[in-house]
Swiss-Prot record:
Keywords: Cell inner membrane, Cell membrane, Membrane, Photosynthesis, Photosystem II, Transmembrane, Transmembrane helix. The chain crosses the membrane at residues 10-30. GO terms for biological process: photosynthesis. The gene is psb30. Signal peptide: none annotated. NCBIfam families: PRK13686.1 (NF010239). This is Photosystem II reaction center protein Psb30. A core subunit of photosystem II (PSII), probably helps stabilize the reaction center. PSII is composed of 1 copy each of membrane proteins PsbA, PsbB, PsbC, PsbD, PsbE, PsbF, PsbH, PsbI, PsbJ, PsbK, PsbL, PsbM, PsbT, PsbX, Psb30/Ycf12, peripheral proteins PsbO, CyanoQ (PsbQ), PsbU, PsbV and a large number of cofactors. It forms dimeric complexes. Belongs to the Psb30/Ycf12 family. Coiled coil: none annotated.
Length: 37
């Protein structure tokens, strides 16, 4: 995976990490909100 612009790779990795972290975070938030009500 050789990109011309190294920033593109960095941004792609950041987005991938954000998505992987956001998935469980959203599920946890939704789960705790459901328990409180």
């Amino acid at each position: 995976m050789a990109w011309r612009n190294p920033m593109n790779t960095l941004i792609s990795l950041l987005l991938l990490t954000l998505i992987m972290l956001a998935g469980p975070a959203v599920i946890a938030l939704w789960y705790f909100r459901g328990r409180q009500v």
